[in-house]
Amino acid sequence: MVKAVVVLKGESYVHGTVCFTQESENAPVCITGEIKDMDADAKRGMHVHEFGDNTNGCTSAGPHYNPFKKHHGAPTDSERHVGDLGNIQTNSCGAAQLDFSDKIISLYGPHSIIGRSLVVHASTDDLGKGGNEESLKTGNAGARLACGVIGIST
C-alpha cells in the first residue's frame, strides 16, 4: 500500500488537506480530505498538475498532468488527462468534503502523481465540453486558488 498527502494553500484564503491511498499497483486511488474557505454551494475544478514546483505560487505547477497527450475530460471519460479529477462540491459554509476514488491516477510506477502538484481552481470545470480550445486544455476552470506538492506519507 502507498499513501500520499498534500497540504493546499495559496494566495487566496482557500486551504485544506487531501490524502491519497492506493492498496496495490492496479487498484484505484482513494482520495479523502477537506478543503475550506471556498465559495458556498459551488463546484470547483481540481486537478493534478505536472510539476511539484510552487516557487512562483500555483503558476509554477505547470499544466495538467497529461503524459499520454490527451484532451481534457471528465474523470469518467476515456479521453482525459491523467490529472483530471473533475469538480469538487462545496457546502453552504464553503467547505468540500472529499471521499471518492479514481482509476487513472496512480501512486505507483513511472506515471505516479507523487511529487506533482494538486491545484484547486476558482471556477467550475466544464470537463472538456465547453466547445473551445481552452476547454480541451483546462476545462475553463479558471485561476489557481490553492495548491500543494503531493508527498509520500506513512
Swiss-Prot record:
SUPFAM superfamilies: Cu,Zn superoxide dismutase-like. It is a peripheral membrane protein. GO terms for molecular function: copper ion binding; superoxide dismutase activity. It catalyses: 2 superoxide + 2 H(+) = H2O2 + O2. Keywords: Antioxidant, Cell membrane, Copper, Cytoplasm, Disulfide bond, Membrane, Metal-binding, Mitochondrion, Oxidoreductase, Zinc. This is Superoxide dismutase [Cu-Zn]. Binds 1 copper ion per subunit. Binds 1 zinc ion per subunit. It is found in: Cytoplasm; Mitochondrion; Cell membrane. Gene3D superfamilies: Superoxide dismutase, copper/zinc binding domain. PROSITE patterns: SOD_CU_ZN_1, SOD_CU_ZN_2. Zn(2+) binds at H64, H72, H81, D84. Disulfide bonds join C58-C147. The keyword S-adenosyl-L-methionine does not apply.
